[in-house]
Amino acid sequence: VGNPYARGEDSSVQSNMTVTLKDFYADWCGPCKTQDPIIEELEADWEGVEFEKVDVDEHQDVANEYQVRSIPTIVVENDDGVVERFVGVTQRDELEDALQEAGA
């Protein structure tokens, strides 16, 4: 008699969810350059997550849609919408927590 909602059962449902990390940046942004290696490490380790870099100078429409006012801004979302938003340089552990919360 097990719990049907036990973590092992639940993870298969979560793995079907699309999880995306959007990294809003600009080439001239110093803190964005600090953020880059952290994002690159995550991308190498989190195969099931879609990573998108969004240059705010080239894609102002997308930046406006996500209400990006400062960079770097990182948005973690899944099929249900935005799960977490980070403004400024964000450490790997915080981003990993958000990816897990999103269902990755």
Locate the predicted segments by residue.
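Typically the conserved alpha-helix immediately C-terminal to a functionally engaged Cys/Sec
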Residues: 33-46
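Thiol-based oxidoreductase modules, predominantly thioredoxin-like and allied folds used
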Residues: 24, 43-60
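The canonical Cys-X-X-Cys-His
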Residues: 29-32, 74
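Structural micro-motif
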Residues: 66-75
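N-terminal amphipathic/basic-hydrophobic helices that include classical n-h-c signal peptides
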Residues: 1-16
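Short active-site neighborhood of thiol/selenol oxidoreductases, capturing the structured segment around
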Residues: 17-25
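Non-catalytic, surface beta->alpha helical segment in thiol-disulfide oxidoreductase systems
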Residues: 76-104
